């Protein structure tokens, strides 16, 4: 029960409905994150679930560690702005988790040793919470280079963004993108496809 693992059982908040991420093992623990599993259809689109009467809003996705020996969960922290965590990955060399939230596409970095979370803000216009020109599909994967500590993800317009561990900053990759003829042509402001995200 993910809601119980997050310490929210009996709190009558919208539950932790699923995990949408790859699980990564490091030092005998599996690291992963939770995501909302209860949605409301608003203007024909899935949005954060509106709580039924007597219930509280979704508290946000949790970063969790599962100890493979003891079978115990450890709650590491919450996603920025009470959003779900759509994807995450771990730099096992430096103990840094990287994530993207849903629906807004906030990119963040979390230090396991200090439990310091740094938000780099929305990286996908207004993400899947946007309407019209501000709508963008949020990337579903983050690649990590254990040698450099860099993390990469994409935008639906095809930009490749890189987190640099040496500067603790996010920057666009210059001179390369995901907008290739063989991927087809996409309107990044329309729903129903991943656009130029990998």
Feature names for model-found ranges:
Residues 36-38, 103, 157:
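Residue-level signature of beta-propeller blades and closely related beta-rich strand-turn architectures
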Residues 1-6, 74-78, 118-125, 171-185:
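Beta-propeller fold detector
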Residues 30-32, 96-99, 150-153:
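Conserved beta-propeller blade signature
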Residues 61-64, 106-108, 159-161:
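A short loop-to-beta-strand structural motif that recurs across blades of beta-propeller domains
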Residues 33-58:
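Short, conserved, GDST-rich strand-edge loop motifs in beta-rich repeat architectures
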Residues 25-27, 91-94, 144-148:
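Residue-level detector of Asp-centered blade-edge/turn motifs that repeat once per structural unit
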Residues 67-71, 111-115, 164-168:
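Short loop/turn segments that connect beta-strands within beta-propeller blades
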Residues 14-22, 83-89, 129-143, 182-188, ...:
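Repeated scaffold domains used in trafficking and secretory/extracellular systems
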């Amino acid at each position: 029960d993910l809601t119980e693992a997050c310490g929210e059982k009996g709190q009558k908040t919208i539950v932790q409905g699923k995990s949408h991420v790859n699980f990564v093992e490091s030092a005998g623990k599996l690291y992963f994150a939770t995501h909302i599993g209860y949605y409301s259809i608003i203007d024909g689109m899935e949005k954060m679930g509106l709580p039924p009467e007597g219930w509280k809003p979704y508290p946000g996705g949790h970063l969790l560690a599962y100890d493979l020996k003891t079978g115990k969960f450890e709650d590491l922290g919450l996603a920025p702005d009470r959003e779900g965590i759509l994807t995450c990955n771990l730099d096992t060399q430096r103990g840094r988790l990287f994530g993207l939230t849903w629906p807004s596409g906030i990119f963040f970095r979390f230090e396991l040793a200090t439990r310091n979370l740094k938000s780099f803000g929305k990286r996908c216009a207004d993400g899947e919470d946007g309407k019209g020109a501000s709508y963008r599909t949020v990337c579903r994967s983050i690649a990590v280079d254990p040698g450099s500590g860099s993390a990469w993800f994409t935008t639906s317009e095809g930009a490749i963004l890189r987190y640099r561990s040496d500067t603790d900053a996010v920057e666009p990759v210059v001179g390369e993108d995901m907008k290739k003829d063989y991927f087809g042509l996409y309107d990044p402001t329309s729903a129903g496809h991943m656009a130029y995200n990998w």
